[in-house]
Amino acid sequence: MNDIELIYDKVKDKYNLTLTNSLALNEGFTWDVPVIYGEFQQGRFWLYADEDVPNPHGIEFVFSVEYEKQTWFRKQPKKYHTHWHPQTIEQAIQDIDKFMLGKHPFIK
C-alpha cells in the first residue's frame, strides 16, 4: 500500500472521496499517479504524491484545491486555485478534514 492509499484508507469511511489515478480524472495531468479526489461545499481537491520532488520526510505530497469564495464587492463568487505540500501523512489527513468540514482558512 502506497502513502496515498494509506491516507485514503484512513478517511474513506468519513467522507465521500474517490481513490483513482490522475489520468482517469481527465483534469489535465500529464503523468499517471494515484490521487484522492474530493468535493466539498465550495469546491474540490486533489491529493497526490510527487515522487520526483525531494523531501527530507520521504515522498512529497501535493494538495491542490479549486474553490469559490464570496467577496463583499462581487455579486458572483470568485474562483481560486492553489496548492501546497503537506509534509506528512498526518498533515495531509488534517487538510482533508478541514476542507470536508468547511473549516479550512481558505474557505472561511
Please provide the spans of the model-predicted regions:
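Intrinsically disordered, low-complexity regulatory segments enriched in Ser/Thr/Pro
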Residues: 41-91
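Short intrinsically disordered terminal tails
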Residues: 1-2, 101-108
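Polar/charged side chains located within well-ordered beta-strands of beta-rich proteins
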Residues: 10-14, 31, 44-46, 63-67, ...
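Negatively charged, low-complexity tracts enriched in Asp/Glu with abundant Ser/Thr
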Residues: 1-41
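Compositionally biased amphipathic helical and low-complexity segments enriched in hydrophobic
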Residues: 7, 18-20, 24-26, 48, ...
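A short, charged, amphipathic alpha-helix used as a generic interaction element across diverse proteins
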Residues: 88-100
